[in-house]
């Protein structure tokens, strides 16, 4: 029920982004992540309080992004950065940390993409480029971490994590590149598709890795 509501509302929101209907966006976007949180709380065998808090930070960031002004976007990026840090903490607590050399190799594709996007958007970002670069460091680390773990240990959990990370990384790139195109509504709709799929797959990763029967243990060991 919660998952169905999540996807139906997400579909309506994506269409609203394409049609640039601000009223429908305001009616639907604030509901997307709450339904995903409810789905997670219902399906998880060991609820992670950190993950719920991370999704709440992502939810606040999404509300900030609706305004589409530099001031709100800046604070939205800050909240999303906190979300990213919490997600990395959770994942590193669950998965085995690879050695430095494989991690660096796995990070190269993500480093390349970030360098290219930064060069294209530097003039638009201005001083905010430093905040974008900080967020980029965490995204690059998570991307390299996910890719190496997937290559070294091929299983469903690592596949979910890798695909989710790639979707979220490309979502950030499109979010910036839309400022270079007149038809930004198309890119915004694509960015939302990637965001929704990325969040859903990350939630599935959390559910898949939580096998403990103590459903309301909020500690991450």
Annotate the PLM regions.
Residues 1-221:
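Polytopic alpha-helical membrane-helix bundles and their juxtamembrane interface segments
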């Amino acid at each position: 029920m919660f998952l169905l509501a999540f996807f139906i509302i997400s579909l309506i929101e994506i269409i609203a982004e394409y049609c640039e209907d601000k009223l429908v966006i305001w009616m639907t976007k604030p509901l997307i992540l709450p339904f995903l949180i409810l789905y997670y709380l219902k399906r998880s065998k060991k609820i992670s309080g950190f993950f719920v808090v991370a999704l709440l930070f992502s939810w606040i960031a999404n509300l900030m992004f609706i305004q589409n002004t530099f001031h709100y976007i800046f604070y939205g990026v800050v909240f999303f950065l906190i979300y990213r840090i919490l997600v990395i903490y959770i994942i590193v607590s669950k998965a085995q940390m690879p050695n430095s050399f494989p991690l660096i190799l796995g990070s190269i594709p993500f480093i390349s993409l970030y360098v290219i996007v930064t060069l294209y958007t530097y003039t638009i970002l201005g001083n905010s480029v430093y905040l974008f670069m900080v967020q980029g460091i965490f995204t690059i680390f998570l991307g390299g971490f996910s890719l190496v773990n997937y290559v070294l240990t091929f299983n469903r959990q690592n596949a979910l994590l890798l695909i989710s990370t790639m979707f979220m990384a490309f979502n950030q790139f499109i979010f910036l590149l839309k400022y270079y195109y007149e038809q930004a509504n198309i890119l915004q709709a694509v960015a939302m598709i990637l965001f929704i799929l990325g969040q859903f797959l990350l939630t599935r990763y959390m559910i898949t890795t939580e096998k403990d029967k103590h459903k309301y243990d909020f500690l991450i060991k």
